Design a protein with these regions (language model features):
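Secondary-structure "cap/kink" motif recognition
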Residues: 1-172
């Protein structure tokens, strides 16, 4: 009886020690996710979106965003607000590749990607992104940042908010 009690207490001590070690190591684990875009609408003058041969240039005049070269179509304020809201929440989840040869697999090469340039008040490009569609998960997408080779998996799919056709219904 005494031997069974000692064995039981020993097992209990081992389980408690494993639990405490696990808790300690879990506290030291840090997530590596970070925000993709740290932008505000106030610092931007232009947004250029290009997909294939189509491109659209959005220009901020005073506090209103307009489509360059188009007097009849107006951008709804809610479309711009939704873009900045989604853009501020997107996180980089994983690095998928650093190999330029694999860009086409993630649809972030120059011909198949959706390009986004953010230009400040001094006409300098502050950020340049190439987004690619995921073939398996339509709620997320891939991105290259500022002409770097790394391709990242993002937490959300922003491509649906990047329409390069000015007659797209959200802009009319």
């Amino acid at each position: 009886m005494n031997k069974k009690l000692i064995i039981s207490l020993s097992i209990l001590c081992v389980v408690i020690a494993v639990y405490l070690l696990n808790s300690h190591f879990q506290k030291t684990y840090n997530s590596s996710s970070k925000n993709l875009m740290n932008i505000t609408e106030e610092g931007l003058k232009k947004i250029i979106i290009q997909s294939g041969q189509e491109a659209i240039e959005l220009i901020k005049e005073d506090s209103v965003w307009n489509i360059a070269g188009n007097d009849t179509l107006k951008i709804k304020e809610q479309v711009i607000n939704r873009f900045f809201d989604i853009a501020s929440k997107i996180e980089i989840q994983n690095t998928m590749t650093s190999n330029k040869e694999k860009w086409s697999k993630y649809n972030v090469d120059d011909s198949s990607g959706v390009h986004l340039a953010l230009i400040d008040m001094d006409d300098k490009t502050i950020n340049y992104y190439v987004f690619g569609r995921s073939k398996t998960d339509f709620t997320r997408c891939y991105a290259r940042i500022n002409q770097e080779n790394e391709v990242y998996l993002l937490s959300e799919n922003i491509i649906y908010n990047l329409q390069s056709n000015p007659t797209f219904a959200a802009f009319s």
